[in-house]
Amino acid sequence: KEGNAIKKEADITPLRPADVKLLKNYPTVKLTKGAVLYSDFPNSKIDAIAPELEGMTAFCLNAENQRQEGTAIEFTSDDAVNLLVGYFRDDQKKYAKAPKLETDASANDYGQAEPKLTNAIRIKGMPLANVHSYHFPAGTHKLLLPKGYTLVLGFTDQSVTPRNAALAGAEETMDWMFY
């Protein structure tokens, strides 16, 4: 579309992974179609992914541990970074709740309240996920994510341009307007 800056997928370049030192031994995987992000769900492979996320260094976590204990990410960075976290578009208890200012005063402590990429990742057998960006200055940090399944999609030193990655079908996109 002319005038309104709607990017075509061909114009979208992948985000650059940032250099961070992880303070725990988290298993990682390169984000690409077919990758597995849950060690205990080997058949839950990525079916589709927003082009911005292609090649990021994601974490391969244990979903049941996330559900029981939540997820803690500890890291050090020499520069400001954004940690990308995917929240599934489903309100079942097994999925972590996305940050919402209406119900959680800390929901924007890291600039994460609004999703940056909606309908951005589709995993076999799971709902679509939206991507939120948590911003951290240089230094040592510990992020505690809520209990439930989330996707830890990696660190970047670039900002994420908000958009609908449109991996949903037409009906799902309409549903999203009323979500």
Describe every region a protein language model picked out.
Residues 79-91:
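A short beta-strand element within beta-rich, extracytoplasmic domains
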Residues 4, 9, 17, 47-49, ...:
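Residue-level detector of intrinsically disordered, flexible termini
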Residues 62-65, 69-82, 132-141:
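Extracellular and analogous surface-interaction loops
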Residues 1-23, 136, 144-148, 155-179:
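Activation corresponds to long, low-complexity, non-globular regions
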Residues 11-66, 168-179:
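Glycan-recognition and processing domains
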Residues 96-164:
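Contiguous ligand/interfacial binding patches
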Residues 3-4, 65, 93, 125:
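Intrinsic-disorder/low-complexity loop/linker signature
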